[in-house]
């Protein structure tokens, strides 16, 4: 499968409680639990993800939590308690498509912002949208982040939760852009933003060069 483009290869060593619970709520497959190791892979074209999911599942004991097949991109999420199983399945996928982790696309921050002292109207509107996380409370600060490709948003969310006392409102890792919404005090949301930015920088240190990134 030499014609497969590796867009996202994102390993998380230990899912944080809020993110794990969010993924379990939104998962169409086998739900993860806090502390699981997790690997998010995005490839193009989208249909290739079926074959890659099959290879990953047959390589070790990992479970498949998500698989989304779009025309342009395909995404899969695998997880397991033992990091070694997740990493071994990831290596099996990389061998199949003749790529290394460093061949993945870099992550571009398309938007980042902290909105302080959210108004009741704004909070209510966000809470009534199709979110699967906690409710946004008026008066709190809201951290929003958008990444391209979409799949990297999960790792950014995990590290932001690890670094700061913030509440996960929503995280969407499919389509052209990934979107993250978190809530907390002004200081905590600023810390979450710094952690997310540092995570993206570490991803880009081991990614291929691409125009516009």
Curated annotation (Swiss-Prot):
KW Repeat (keyword) present: yes
Gene3D superfamilies in the cross-refs: 3.30.70.1710
Stretches assigned to the BMC circularly permuted domain: 5-106, 108-213
Classification via CDD domains: BMC_like_1_repeat1, BMC_like_1_repeat2
Effect of disrupting the coding gene: Not required for growth in ambient air.
Any one GO CC term of the record: carboxysome
Main location: other
Keyword Lipoprotein: no
Subcellular location: Carboxysome
Keywords for the protein's UniProt record, in alphabetical order: Bacterial microcompartment, Carbon dioxide fixation, Carboxysome, Repeat
One BP term from GO: carbon fixation
Applied biotechnology: Expression of 10 genes for alpha-carboxysome (Cb) proteins (cbbL-cbbS-csoS2-csoS3-csoS4A-csoS4B-csoS1C-csoS1A-csoS1B-csoS1D) in E.coli generates compartments that resemble Cb, contain RuBisCO and have its catalytic activity, showing it is possible to make artificial, functional Cb using these 10 genes. Cargo proteins can be targeted to these organelles. Artificial Cb assembly in E.coli requires csoS2-csoS4A-csoS4B-csoS1C-csoS1A-csoS1B-csoS1D (but not the gene for carbonic anhydrase, csoS3).
Placement of sequence motif Gates the pore: 70-71
Signal sequence region: none
Record remark: domains: Contains 2 BMC domains, trimerizes in a staggered manner to give a hexamer; each subunit in one trimer interacts with 2 subunits in the facing trimer. Each stacked hexamer can form a pore of about 14 Angstroms in diameter. Dimerization of the trimers forms a channel-like compartment, accessible via an open pore. This channel may be large enough to accomodate transport of substrates into and out of the carboxysome.
Subunit and interaction comment: Homotrimer. Forms a dimer of stacked trimers, the same faces interact. Probably forms a CsoS1-CsoS1D-CsoS2 complex.
Role summary: Part of the carboxysome shell, a polyhedral inclusion where RuBisCO (ribulose bisphosphate carboxylase, cbbL-cbbS) is sequestered. It may control transport of RuBisCO reactants in and out of the carboxysome. In an E.coli expression system not absolutely necessary, its presence leads to fewer defective carboxysomes, suggesting this subunit may play a role in assembly. Unlike beta-carboxysomes, alpha-carboxysomes (Cb) can form without cargo protein. CsoS2 is essential for Cb formation and is also capable of targeting foreign proteins to the Cb. The Cb shell assembles with the aid of CsoS2; CsoS1A, CsoS1B and CsoS1C form the majority of the shell while CsoS4A and CsoS4B form vertices. CsoS1D forms pseudohexamers that probably control metabolite flux into and out of the shell.
Protein family (similarity comment): Belongs to the EutL/PduB family.
Protein name: Carboxysome shell protein CsoS1D
The organism's taxonomic lineage, starting at the top: Bacteria, Pseudomonadati, Pseudomonadota, Gammaproteobacteria, Chromatiales
